[in-house]
Every structure is written in C-alpha cells, then in structure tokens.
Amino acid sequence: MPLLSVKKLTENFDGLCANSNINMEINEGELVGLIGPNGAGKTTLFNMLTGVYVPSEGSIEFTKDDKPIKLNGIKPYKITALGLARTFQNIRLFKDMTVLENVLIAMNKDVDYGVITALLRLPKYYKSEIAMKKKAMELLTIFHLEDKCEELACNLPYGEQRRLEIARAMA
C-alpha cells in the first residue's frame, strides 16, 4: 500500500489549468524529486498535497497506520498532524527565536496538556515538555544542528537555516 497516492489530480484557477490529471504513488522509504520549469505547477501540486488548495478534481490519499485517509478538503494543520508537512521556497523561520525554539514551536500539535496544567506547572506539563525537547534535539542531531540549539535562527548561515526549516517540518 503506497504511503501517498494521487489520482487524476487537477487544479484550475479561473479557467487556467495549473495541474492536469496527475497520478503518482510514493511508497514508504522512497525519495522522490519533482523537477520542472518555472510555472509548471510544482508549487500548486505541493499546495494541493498539503491542503493549502483543494483540488478541482481527483483524490489524494495518505496512509497512516495502514489506513488510507482521503486528504481532499482537510485543513492544512490536520494534514501536518497526520505527518505530511512541507517547507517553503523562502525561508520562514522565527528569526528572533533559538534553533531549539523553532523546532519546539512546530510541535504544538503534540501538546497534551491544557492552559491550567501549564500555568500551575503540574507534572504532566514537565513530562510533556521534556519529551518534546528530547524529540527536538534528536531532530537537530539528525540535521547536525544540535551544537547550535541555543543560537538565534537569524545568526545561522543560509544552508543551516534551510536544514532547520526541514527539521521543523519534520517535528
């Protein structure tokens, strides 16, 4: 069963066809590239896959825990929570936050405590925060940014900012 399945995906903007009849399957562990000239519809495809645009026609299915989930019409934040995330062509980091904070902020979907628990600093708050920090540091280690975890994102060179953005998307 494919991890991501796209069938007859089409997107029209007021009569302009940006994508037409796209079909593809991506299996777990595959690394796939999408190449094309400016204006070919690459970003439009990613916007449909991540819920920014609802396709004019066709279907998108993402498999999680061996269950296919139809993504058409699902809000982008819910698609991200399922595990399908994206980065953008332009870097969109929180420049005045640390490298670690940039990854942690992307983990807000994993917060399992309420405002009262956070305000009172109850044990559940600390347990959750420690688990998220551990996961964030694991991601930073994968992207060779663990030694920069306390640096402001704006102080990183461009290549490291891109890696941070990918780590944040994976959080």
Mark where each language-model region is:
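The feature captures the beta-strand-to-loop junction immediately N-terminal to the Walker
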Residues: I35-P37
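Helix-to-loop junction immediately C-terminal to a conserved catalytic motif
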Residues: T50
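ABC ATPase NBD Q-loop/coupling interface
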Residues: S59-L82, L120-Y125
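Conserved ABC ATPase "signature" region
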Residues: V115-K148
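Hydrophobic anchor residue at the start of the ABC signature
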Residues: I166
